[in-house]
Amino acid sequence: MHYMGLNEIREKFLEFFESKGHLRLPSFSLIPQGDKSLLLINSGMAPLKPYFTGEQEPPRRRVTTCQKCIRTGDIENVGKTARHGTFFEMLGNFSFQDYFKEEVIPWAWEFLTSDEWMAIPKDKLFISVYQEDDEAYDIWTQKVGIAPDHMVRLGKEDNFWEHGSGPCGPCSEIYFDRGPEYGCGKPTCGVGCDCDRYMEIWNLVFSQFDADGKGHYERLARPNIDTGMGLERLACVMQGVGNLFEVDTVQSVLHHVEHLSGKTYKQDDKTDISIRVITDHIRSCTFMVSDGILPSNEGRGYVLRRLLRRAARHGRMLGINRPFLVELVETVIQSSESAYPELREHDAYIKKVIGTEEANFARTIDAGMNILNNMIDGLEKAHQHLLKGLDVFKLNDTFGFPLDLTKEIAAEQGIEIDEDGFHAEMKKQKERARAERLKKNISGWSEDLFGGLDAEPTVFTGYNTLTTEGVVVALSDEETLTDAISTDDQAKEGVLVVLDKTPFYAEMGGQAADHGVITGAECSLRVLDVKKTPKGYYVHTCVLESGIVKVGDHLTAKVDKEYRMAIARNHTATHLLQAALREVLGDHVHQAGSYQDASITHFDFTHFSAVTPEELARVQKIVNDKIYESMNVTVKEMPIEEAKKLGAMALFGEKYGKVVRVVDIEGWSTEFCGGTHVKNTAQIGGFKIVSESSVAAGIRRIEAVTGRNLLIRANLQEAMLHTVANTLKANNITSLPIRAEAVMAENKAMSKELEEIKAKVAASKVDSLFDNAEEVGGVKIASAYFTGTTGDTLRGMCDSIRDKAVNPCVAVLVGKTDDKITMAVTVNKLAQEKGLKAGNLVKEISAIAGGKGGGKPDFAMAGLKEETKIDEALAAVKGIVEKQLG
């Protein structure tokens, strides 16, 4: 056995199983695809579940991978010991109803012990098998030749893989004996002991049964193989090191942490914890961001935020009082890019996301820590040990302290937190937000109004027709259900109509509802909005313009064709926009929200910086190019697995059924979508981005117009330009830039002239300023309050005072313009020699009027808040100067 780097070990493993007929697959994303049971991929087998369950056909019966994984179940222990980490890589070889124990056991032994591969001494390896698995035991002892004293039979708890119902089976684990120095010293120490001597490096799982979850097992006709070997653990063996933080690729990151902090690893237990936390967490964060995860307060985004902020806090504990994590990203990339080239492809984006998140936290961490420490001090003085849920909530809401971070910091001081109280406050916040959303809802009715309706769900016909005959199954005036509603003498608003069939699209998926009319023999209604209830009823919010409408009436529902078309233009354009953004900005762009009505579309997407004007121009050009190419837009319903194979983009977090609706634009854009669309991109007419902005951390928004709205907007802008041209007395729009430059030049000249006049006025004021000056300790003191005087003018006056004064002097001047009050203090050189400094004076004097400021020994400024205390502050100047003279 000789030293081997982690990257070399990974490649050797994959090469070995390729030589055994396996297809090498790249690591899957850390984001589970179609598996709601997982937040993050945490094993080599996890992304391959569909192949094991038969939901999908594997690309080959034999597959090998090195899968990046993250586990955060024991995050609070990461750093405290060298055994725990959140990021790891899992080597694996898999058989989908192909080979079984007879092949996989000898292969595992060959890879570990052959001189061509790992060359681990055979006497260092021990094997465990399930106590009833004689087949595996015999293969190990008879075919491979393992001595019985290196074999151990263990029970179901240790050597049987089972997770509820479904495929399961016994497993066989391979252990490496690290030597007695790692052991517990007990006579009973052996494989299965809790000490560190026997380290499990490879688990071979034999899926040969189908469990019903009730203790019954049926043998599978065609069993599977699933193996997993921790790459970092094997690297510990091959490099002869004690733990994962000493493995070469991890060490490179750890050494960088040492360099940034000026601390040395293994010299102080407390320091070591922080170094390990940062080393581990930055590796996880780098890979998570590379796979498109962004910091947030929910789900995997919360995990990322928690890791980043925990690492940032430990940086503070090492004395790194600035954002620094982004500097470690490059080291992580360099150590792993040979196996994960996407890290290098996304390096700028990864650094931007991590840098921005850390900078955001840096702005609040110190204030938050001070508040938390004060809370803990207060508890200790009161001999209490429970931090209130409301206080924990405030730390989260105001300073961005995740619950777990507060919990960890408090635990270090022996303080517990009221988690139930915290969650109660979070629930209240969500309820407040929900109430606000309900206030903004244009319809005042509650979904509960139709909750007891005993009728079939409304049939939506609007994909194929804009006109449908329907029967009224329910009516309401937004307060109660009723059998009939009439207009009396005037139109009646807030009439809610439920039909058995409707062509009206209800507001959902970010698309606004259709408008139109519902008419019958005795009534005419104008439809303003449509909502779909959880039970599937389409509720039309209408104005009853004439007549009477009754339950049971047969009516004609007709959608406004042009209004529907305007929405369709915007919706299809949004699909083109997302594809264009991914092409220009990168594959990390994902939809985070959208809204389309007849006048505008806005699209929210994941991106961590403002989109540059150049990038926006490229995006806009791409969308318009696709419009002018007259691409066909096709809509199909298909099984969800078929849609995924086509590469259809789904909205993250959205729940889909077995059959989905897919909107495809000639393969250039393919998305799951239930909305209405044009049939050809040429019908969009044109696309114009009107704004780009931030709506949340890591979320940008683009607003755009299409079709006739583009022309309307252009006409409005042209009219505005004509108005500006007339105001500036330009001959026409084309000469507007020249005229604007001329006006700016005139304005600049007048501003210069005004400043010269102000300077002369200031000079005249300065000349008389010391006429009635007081004197303290040989220093002349002048103070004055000027209205209509800017800070720049005060600065000029102070410069003039210092230039002209021949004796020690101090001047304290206050100026006010609009609502801004400024104080300026100057101390000439002769007064400085007596120990006076402008910066010290301005701090003490301005504080009287609620001000704050500072500066240099000769000049300082402050902003004042309390105008009523200006006279008091100026009256105190003499005493403060006298005090500071000593």
What would you call each of these model-derived segments?
Residues M1-G886:
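A glycine- and charged-residue-rich anion-binding loop/surface
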